Amino acid sequence: MSKKPTAGPALHKVIMVGSGGVGKSALTLQFMYDEFVEDYEPTKADSYRKKVVLDGEEVQIDILDTAGQEDYAAIRDNYFRSGEGFLCVFSITDDESFQATQEFREQILRVKNDESIPFLLVGNKCDLNDKRKVPLSECQLRAQQWAVPYVETSAKTRENVDKVFFDLMREIRSRKTEDSKATSGRAKDRCKKRRLKCTLL
């Protein structure tokens, strides 16, 4: 008797978005390989996959580090469609990159058409607090307006690097559980309706 193939670990798809030079790649590489790579700006999107243990369960995280082609709307929209959760990164030392998060958020909501998509606002380079250009209160206010978590990270010192990826994976997992319950509830309703129709006949 052949055994049913066992399902592999759950896969969570994360998309990194943000202006150039804010440290999206540095955060990704620090999380993937425990290495700080300064001034790494890829010219094309890079995809990374890693097995991790999330709250005692082995899962896979798939990270798409967007770059360069974000200027091409069709390519950018395809990336956004494939994502289950988003880390929207800016540098606390660069106000322009903070202002740009508004546009990234709007683009994602337009493509996903879903206000409650798993999403974290990430202020990177918190090791350079003496060069801070974006007040903490302003960052927290924006996150509050969007109803999303706000976390400050440093790809250099590794501060909160694991936290943002794991927190986002938890949000994605929670969302999948809710969606699965909703789908199963709708299927049960359809079955009930079919049974009622049979009874009426």
UniProtKB/Swiss-Prot annotation:
Binding site residues for GTP: 18-25, 65-69, 124-127
Cysteine pairings via disulfide bonds: none
InterPro entries given in the database record: P-loop_NTPase (IPR027417), Small_GTP-bd (IPR005225), Small_GTPase (IPR001806), Small_GTPase_Ras-type (IPR020849)
E.C. numbers: 3.6.5.2
Compartments, record wording: Cell membrane; Cleavage furrow; Midbody, Midbody ring
Reaction(s) the record says it catalyses: GTP + H2O = GDP + phosphate + H(+)
Residues recorded as bearing Cysteine methyl ester in the entry: C198
Pfam assignment, any one: Ras
Bilayer topology term: Lipid-anchor
UniProt keyword list: Cell membrane, GTP-binding, Hydrolase, Lipoprotein, Membrane, Methylation, Nucleotide-binding, Prenylation
Lipid attachment locations (S-geranylgeranyl cysteine): C198
EC class name: hydrolase
Family: Belongs to the small GTPase superfamily. Ras family.
Protein's name in the database: Ras-related protein Ral-a
Gene responsible for this protein: Rala
